[in-house]
């Protein structure tokens, strides 16, 4: 059984990434399907949880993802060269220069008393309405902002010219994720938070370099959405009760603008804590030997992995969720600040953007190519574990067909709870909560199977679901597992 320490390993909380899987749910797969010294790959590694767990269990890992932001997260996760004491010392220098700049932006003087705002409620047009601050006893209080002071601030903000660099990268138009025509990354921020982020970025560049700078930047990108216009208030809990950025770029009628210095310092503490946790695990102790395995972070297209045939002992992956999460389009908020450019044309995704030719047919073709690559690099009779969540039958068909076409034989399946859920899972009672986890074995023989077309599949699934409901299985998870049992038991 996993200990509470293992379940809450801080190394996996340094940065957001969609669909992050809980280590305690996937770590046992490494012991079950691989040996010490084996080579393990995740072609769509994302945050890199599985690969990190495998590395710490002395497997040689290949951490692959086409998204540069994912590569950067993995680089920080796996780095052993960070000097934490140096990071803390450099932060003192950065904070010394940043503090007055940020305080000038977030200090309000009301009735002769100065307040340092932690969070500010603003209308969509930008007018500040309320703010939170700490009292002398460290209690958080909420105060209204007089209209005259709010108007004066808006005039100051509008006239201000930002002298430090910031990205003005265009966001791909996609109404499904509220990415509208001519929207840029800069539009996701108020002038105040954009100026503060730009100043912080410049000071990181001034005072730090190497692995220490990377750790600052991982905290920086992790904090961007927290201090953007994307933070919604949870009105049922109070005007300044914060929600979290999940997906997309929707800006509500009101949003919460957070103090960049205050929130960055919190994110930096999490990054340092996560790094210390990782370094401690790598070093080992009396109960666990030092890690002696290797890792490699690659930016290959999953449809064309730069690996020899039959060179991998175990594959685990969580492939793209169809149109549920357009990873590259949403990662622009991170990639732009990191000055990284994704290869959008090679992404495996279903996108509702009319600027991209990424529909279900392209998705099915690309998924099949990536699974063919998994088959090519995986040794005969070795194992491949797959997690997938999608409410679309067509996307599940694409995944299933790719497994069939490549002669992967199911040996096990179960339900896996996620560490983080997409909004549709959180907000819909009838949504699937978590992912199907299926493990396949590669058989060397070629396969020649006839598969049903889309209309036949739809009718078969509808009939099967109707029968399951008649039998008393009414929750979505139960129906999904019944489908798995019907189709995949060997």
What spans do the regions from the language model cover?
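Short glycine-dipeptide loop
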Residues: 36, 340-341, 373, 378-384
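Hydrophobic beta-strand segment of the Class I
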Residues: 315-316
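Conserved beta-strand signature within the Rossmann-like core of class I S-adenosyl-L-methionine
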Residues: 345-346, 382-388
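Conserved SAM/SAH-binding loop
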Residues: 47
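A SAM-dependent methyltransferase catalytic signature shared across enzymes that methylate proteins
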Residues: 383, 401-413
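Nucleic-acid modification enzymes, centered on SAM-dependent nucleic-acid methyltransferases
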Residues: 1-41, 50-51, 55-308, 327-356, ...
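A short glycine-rich, Lys/Arg-flanked "PGG" loop and its adjoining helix->strand segment in the class I
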Residues: 364-380, 405
